[in-house]
Design a protein with these regions (language model features):
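Phosphate-coordination loops involved in phosphoryl transfer and adenosine-cofactor binding
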Residues: 1, 112-115, 192
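Phosphate/diphosphate ligand-binding glycine-rich loop within oxidoreductases
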Residues: 1-108, 202
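Glycine-rich adenosine-cofactor-binding loop
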Residues: 8, 90-95, 102, 109-136, ...
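Short, charged/polar "capping" segments at the starts of alpha-helices
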Residues: 66-67, 145-151, 202-206
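Conserved S-adenosyl-L-methionine
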Residues: 134-138, 213-216
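Rossmann-like adenosine-cofactor binding region
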Residues: 154-218
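Rossmann-fold NAD(P)-binding glycine/threonine-rich loop
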Residues: 194-248
């Protein structure tokens, strides 16, 4: 049996246990899955303990960048969302999971989209921005903290947003889960052709307003499943077709998150 844990702060909403149960079943492996909801002051102690007690750690907000200081090797420029405890190595499966999800939600986006606006500059935003930049799209970043946005732009060779043309908008912030309108907060028009919200557990104002303005929209459920599949494959060495595993696991999860 493989032992996994999820580490984050204020994550009582998480559907990760049920998602990983479905994914592991389709991969043919037995797992246990522990949720560690901890404050920043307890991060080091929690990570140190988990290194000795589990095989892999899945990392969520707000620790995808902070986790790096406890690792011996980091295999990504983006935020770390998967840690292999045996050698204290960090990886990112958010980026590939996001692209899988985007392809599933909008089958024509690769030919129709030239510019993308990414909201946020945390670990998830960095993963999304890097993945999009690697596809050759023009990526623009908008965040309340201009300093962190500027650092992110320098890291990935992308630009801060000053109303450049963009067909796709991606919300990588947690704003909206509590009813906050991130578009209003950042003074952004909702008029885009495509809108993707990484939030999967709430019908956000971001989703509502972009849909009302005519956009094709999607929430983050598929991305959560895709990144979990890639993470479990990485940690266990199991070889499997991600798209095939996704369809079976996602069908199992219908209505559960």
């Amino acid at each position: 049996m493989y032992k996994f844990a999820l580490i984050g702060c204020d994550i009582g909403y998480t559907s990760s246990p049920v998602v990983h149960e479905a994914v592991s079943g389709e991969l043919g492996i037995d797992i246990s899955f522990e949720v560690c909801d901890i404050g920043a002051s307890g991060l080091e102690a929690a990570v140190t303990k988990l290194f000795d007690t589990v095989d892999g750690i899945f990392v969520t907000k707000p620790y995808k960048n902070d986790i790096k200081r406890y690792l011996d090797k980091v295999n990504t420029r983006s935020g770390v969302n998967v840690v292999r405890c045996a050698d204290k190595s960090g990886f990112n499966t958010d980026g590939i999971g996001f692209l899988y999800a985007l392809d599933r939600a909008f089958d024509d986006w690769r030919s129709k989209v030239r510019g993308v606006l990414v909201l946020g500059s945390g670990g998830a935003a960095r993963s999304v921005a890097e993945a999009l930049a690697d596809t050759g799209k023009s990526v623009y970043v908008l965040n309340r903290d201009m300093v962190t946005a500027a650092k992110m732009c320098r890291a990935f060779g992308i630009e801060q947003y000053y109303n450049q043309p963009a067909e796709l908008i991606v919300n990588c912030t947690s704003a909206g889960s509590d009813g906050e309108d991130i578009l209003k907060a950042l003074c952004v028009s909702p008029e885009f052709e495509y809108a993707y919200d990484l939030i999967y557990y709430a019908d956000t104002p971001f989703m509502q307003r972009t849909a009302a303005a005519g956009a094709k929209v999607s929430d983050g459920k598929a991305m959560l499943v895709y990144q979990a599949i890639e993470g479990e494959k990485l940690l266990t060495g199991v070889k499997a077709d991600t798209l095939d595993v996704f369809e079976r696991a996602f069908a199992k999860l219908d209505g559960k998150f």
